[in-house]
Amino acid sequence: MKKTVGKLLIIAGILILAGMMFNGREGFSFFGFDEESARTYHAQAEDIDKIDIDAKSITVNIQAENRDDIKAEISGKNVRLDSSEQGGTLQLSAHSKGFWPFFWKKNELIVKIPSEYKDDLSISSGSGNVKLSGGGLHLRNVALKSGNGSLKADDLQAEDLSVKGTSGSVRLENVQTAAADIRSTSGNTKLENVTGKLSIKQTSGNLRASFTEINDSLSIKQTSGNTKLSLPDDADISLEAESTSGNISHSYSFDQVANEKRTLTGKKGNGKNKIDISITSGNVSIE
């Protein structure tokens, strides 16, 4: 018993020493016991045409406000914010300091941008959530990526939108875009009042999409999971859906429709906007 306890103490000592070495002069923060820290950075919005954010294991929260500058603030235990400006690009890098991330308290990077900002925004998070509260923002190119965390964007306009989630939910609400590429490897996706040319690819997880307007084509490719679509009554669409293993059902009032167990073709209005749905394993419901 004494030998076991001794070995455990030795291992603990080694880990603590490693944690101190990892943090250099910052001292002991192996278990997140250092003082609460927060850092801020300001940039003049008129000098910036792209905001590039890289966060390792920290939640990123983007907020649009009536302001002239861009303000980034990071808070939490054992966190660090690096920033630079070059060629019109503001780069923000947020990461946790310490040895094992599962000992850290919740950390967050809040970036406040002017409501009149109209350029590019790119966010990449390793294992944190990404939240974009657009507040009516009208941006050019928006790219959101999360490895292990949820992605949420609302009240946003973007000419080009890219959303990539590896493990976690994806949720878009009140988003207008010319073209959007939405991909999820493992997790559920929910769209509500999203317009534009949409391409949705999902490996594993359920998709639920509710549209009040369809003004361009919609492509859905899903490997494993169920799909549920709610379409507007006045849609001008032609729809084709097929499932290799699963059922396809509908309660939508198509003008023309042919529905079998695993296929569905339907037309509403002049069939202007095309909807293609391809499911390998899962059910499809259209209402």
Regions found by a protein language model. Name each.
Residues 1-7:
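Positively charged n-region of N-terminal signal peptides that target proteins for export
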Residues 7-23:
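Hydrophobic membrane-insertion alpha-helices, especially the h-region
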Residues 20-38:
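Sec-dependent signal peptide cleavage junction
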Residues 33-50, 59-63, 67, 78-164, ...:
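Right-handed parallel beta-helix
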Residues 52-54:
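A short, Trp-centered hydrophobic/proline-enriched beta-strand micro-motif
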Residues 70:
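Flexible, acidic/glycine-enriched loop-and-adjacent beta/alpha segments
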Residues 73, 79-82, 246-251:
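Short aromatic-acidic-glycine turn motif
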Residues 154-155, 161, 170-287:
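Short, surface-exposed interaction patches in beta-rich subdomains
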